[in-house]
C-alpha cells in the first residue's frame, strides 16, 4: 500500500464521511411557492443529522435563468431568489456547522449562462475584454465550424450575427462554454470560489470538470491535453485549505485517469464521480435511452475493478443515485413488493465498499421512478429527446418507455416527507 495513504495526516475528513445530495427545488418548500428553498433545508437539518451524514452536497442555488435547472449560472456570487437570499444561505452554513454538517456547493466551471454579464459583454464585439472568455469561430451563419453535436441535441455551435461568429456550447445554446485557455477568465472563477470559501463552504462538486480542457478544433471535449494542468492550478489557487473537499464529475474517467485526479498528494481533486457502473445497462454504441438488462456479474467486476484499482493510490466516490439518474430501486431492484428489500440490499452494497458514499434525497426511503404525461416533464434533455425521436418516426410508447426508465426527472420529484397531499413537500402546487 502507498506510504501516502498509510500516513493518516494526509487523509481528509471526507474519507470517513457520508454526503447527502439535496436537489433544492424538490426538497422542502416553506413558502407555498411550489419550489423548495434554502429555509426548507435548514428546517430539516436535525433530520439529516439523525441520518448520520457528514455533509450536504447542494445542487446549484446560484442566480440562474433556470434553463437547465440551475446548471446555467448567471452570477457565481449570488443566490437565486427562487431559493431565498444570501442571508438564508449563511444561516444554512452556520446551522450546519453547529451539527457538524458541512455544505458542499455544486459548481459549474465548464460553462455559464448566456445571461451572465461576461457573455452579454462578450457578444458585443470581438474587441470586448470579455470576448475571449468564450470559444468563438468565424463563419457565414449557415454552416457551423464543424459537425460537433451538443449533449442535449442539435449543433454544438450557435451563431451571433452581430459579430459574425459562432460560439461553442457542449450543452444548451443558453450555456456557452468558458475558454479555459484565458488566464483572466480562470482567475475570475477562482475569485468566485474564494468568495464561498470565505463564507464557510467546505467543498465543491465540480460539474463536468473533465470537459474544461476541451479543444473544439480537434473535436476533443473530455480529458483534453491541458486538463490536468488546469486542475492543478485550480486546486492551488482556489482549494488551498487542506479541509476543502472536491469531487469532480468525470464521465470519461477510467481507473488510470482517476488516479491522476485523486492522487493522495491532493494536487488536483479529492475524488471523482466515474460512471462506468452506471453504463452497464446501456446498449453498446447507443444513447442512454437505449437500455438492456443489467448482467450482475458485470456489475461485480466493474465495482471490484475500481475498488482494487484505486486502493492505496486514489479514492473512490460511491453512488448509485443522483439528480441526473433514475432511481436505482426502479433501475436495478424491484420497486413493487420488494421495494424495501431492494433498497436495503443496494444500500448494503454501497456502504460496504471503500470510498466516500453519496446518497441522494429520498434514497434512504427507497423512492422510485415516476410515469408522467410528456407535458408534465420539465427536464430539457427529456423534452429534446422526445422531440427528436418523434420527428424520426419512433413510436410514442417506446419513447415514453425510455423516458420512464432513464429520464432525469425521475430523481427530481418532491421529497416524500409524509403521506399527506404533495407528500408534505409544499402547501402549494409542486
Q: Where are the language model's segments positioned?
A:
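Active-site and adjacent substrate-binding regions of carbohydrate-active enzymes
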Residues: 1-430
Amino acid at each position: 500500500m502507498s506510504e501516502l495513504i498509510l500516513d493518516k495526516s494526509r487523509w481528509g475528513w471526507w474519507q470517513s464521511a457520508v454526503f447527502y445530495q439535496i436537489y433544492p427545488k424538490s426538497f422542502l418548500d416553506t413558502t407555498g411557492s411550489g419550489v423548495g428553498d434554502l429555509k426548507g433545508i435548514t428546517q430539516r437539518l436535525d433530520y439529516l443529522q439523525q441520518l448520520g451524514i457528514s455533509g450536504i452536497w447542494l445542487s446549484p442555488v446560484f442566480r440562474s435563468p433556470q434553463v437547465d435547472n440551475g446548471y446555467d449560472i448567471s452570477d457565481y456570487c449570488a443566490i437565486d431568489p427562487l431559493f431565498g437570499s444570501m442571508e438564508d444561505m449563511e444561516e444554512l452554513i452556520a446551522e450546519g456547522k453547529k451539527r457538524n454538517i458541512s455544505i458542499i456547493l455544486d459548481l459549474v466551471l465548464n460553462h455559464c449562462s448566456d445571461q451572465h454579464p461576461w457573455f452579454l459583454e462578450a457578444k458585443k464585439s470581438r474587441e470586448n475584454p470579455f470576448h475571449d472568455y468564450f470559444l468563438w469561430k468565424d463563419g457565414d451563419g449557415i454552416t457551423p465550424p464543424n459537425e460537433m453535436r451538443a449533449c442535449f441535441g442539435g449543433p454544438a455551435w450557435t451563431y451571433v450575427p452581430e459579430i459574425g461568429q459562432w460560439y461553442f456550447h457542449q450543452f444548451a445554446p443558453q450555456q456557452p462554454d468558458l475558454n479555459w485557455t484565458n488566464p483572466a477568465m480562470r482567475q475570475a472563477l477562482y475569485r468566485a470560489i474564494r468568495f464561498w470559501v470565505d463564507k464557510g463552504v467546505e467543498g465543491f462538486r465540480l460539474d463536468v470538470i473533465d470537459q474544461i480542457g476541451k479543444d473544439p478544433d480537434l473535436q476533443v471535449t473530455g480529458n483534453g491535453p491541458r486538463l490536468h494542468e488546469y486542475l492543478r492550478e485550480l486546486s492551488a489557487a482556489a482549494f488551498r485549505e487542506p479541509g476543502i473537499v472536491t469531487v469532480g464529475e468525470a464521465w470519461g474517467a477510467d481507473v488510470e485517469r482517476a488516479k491522476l485526479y485523486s492522487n493522495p498528494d491532493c494536487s488536483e481533486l479529492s475524488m471523482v464521480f466515474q460512471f462506468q457502473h452506471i453504463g452497464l445497462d446501456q446498449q453498446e454504441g447507443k444513447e442512454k435511452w437505449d437500455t438492456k438488462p443489467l448482467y450482475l456479474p458485470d456489475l461485480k467486476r466493474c465495482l471490484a475493478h475500481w475498488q482494487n484499482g484505486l486502493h492505496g493510490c486514489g479514492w473512490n466516490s460511491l453512488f448509485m443515485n443522483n439528480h441526473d439518474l433514475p432511481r436505482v430501486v426502479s433501475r436495478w431492484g424491484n420497486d413493487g413488493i420488494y421495494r424495501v428489500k431492494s433498497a436495503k440490499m443496494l444500500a448494503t452494497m454501497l456502504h460496504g465498499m471503500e470510498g466516500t458514499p453519496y446518497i441522494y434525497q429520498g434514497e434512504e426511503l427507497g423512492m422510485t421512478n415516476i410515469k408522467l404525461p410528456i407535458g408534465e416533464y420539465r427536464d430539457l434533455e427529456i423534452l429534446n429527446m422526445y422531440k427528436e425521436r418523434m420527428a424520426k418516426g419512433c413510436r410514442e410508447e417506446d419513447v415514453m418507455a425510455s423516458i420512464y426508465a432513464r429520464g432525469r426527472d425521475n430523481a427530481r420529484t418532491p421529497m416524500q416527507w409524509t403521506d399527506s397531499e404533495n407528500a408534505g413537500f409544499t402547501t402549494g402546487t409542486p
